[in-house]
């Protein structure tokens, strides 16, 4: 069985984690040029005066060249007969665990969903103190899909479709991600779905718990970049 690899065209990590002062959320930070991608949830690193535990999240955006005009886009390769027709081939999203010295979480689920609209990769590198901001620069962040033109996410952390959703369970935290997303890619190739890539995040029950007194207001989903999540986890992943 022949296997062909396609490498990501754009990718970025977006986060609302605290900066080093533990009071400023890094919602404007960009990591589009970093050499790794991070998905995490940190619960209760700080506690507010109202005894509310903090909820810090990180998500991944990633896009592949599916319908571009280049000779090596997936659609171009199919037209040229270098990959099989629909129904005779499968497309897998594969990301590899980057080894490091830190303890990894166990027993969690990652969700994959198509991004709803265009976003910019950006050129940020700093994944420790989040100093690379998108102010006056191109790039997506936790609050915005792009800076020029300025386009805010409808919901902080990205806007995603409710269709073509996938997930993978992780038991040890050391596994690689490998998910069959064939129907989604075929939709991109056929043009029935615009290709803005996918977002990767922890499932809602594994992202950090957060509640607020504003929760009762109709339509409220977040407060100052923190997502309200009353079914979330009260531990970190």
What are these regions (language model features)?
Residues 1-237:
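Secreted, disulfide-rich extracellular signaling modules
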